[in-house]
Amino acid sequence: ILSIHSRSAAKKVVNMINGFDGTVILHWYSGSITDLRRAIELGCYFSINHQMLQSTNGRNIIENIPVDRLLLESDAPFTKGLKEKYTIDFNDEIYEYISGLYQQEIDVVKKRVKANFAKVLKEK
């Protein structure tokens, strides 16, 4: 399992992982939608966090990730610009957003994300 922060290098990273025989998680992905779609085709997962909900680009990216490729992460304590200390409650806001996006109950979304984590751990 590779967890990659591809900031300012999404296209290069997607090109490099093409043909990789393992599981790739793109952490806090911020690249183009074109490269996002290519990464999805390559089987990548995407870890999203509370800060991504705070920007138009972050929300646009989340809206383009299939629910079966979503993972949650905090990036704490390294996330900057927070007005308050990062707590586990921030995950609830992410689940609420995803629930609204996919028009699914929060419990269904939580089970889906948990299943995604389990699948990642079972893959090569």
Task: Tell me what each language-model feature is.
Residues N57-V67:
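Short amphipathic alpha-helices and their capping/turn segments at secondary-structure boundaries
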Residues G22, D68-L71, I106-V108:
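Short acidic capping loops at alpha-helix termini that bridge into adjacent secondary structure
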Residues N18, E63-N64, G100:
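Solvent-exposed polar/charged
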Residues D68-K85:
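Short acidic/histidine-rich active-site segments
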Residues I1-L42, M52, N60, G81-K85, ...:
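Divalent metal-binding pocket/active-site signature
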Residues H27, D75, V109:
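Residue-level signal for inorganic ion chemistry
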Residues D92-K124:
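Mid-to-C-terminal alpha-helical segments outside catalytic/metal-binding sites
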Residues S47:
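A contiguous pocket-lining binding segment that forms or flanks enzyme active sites
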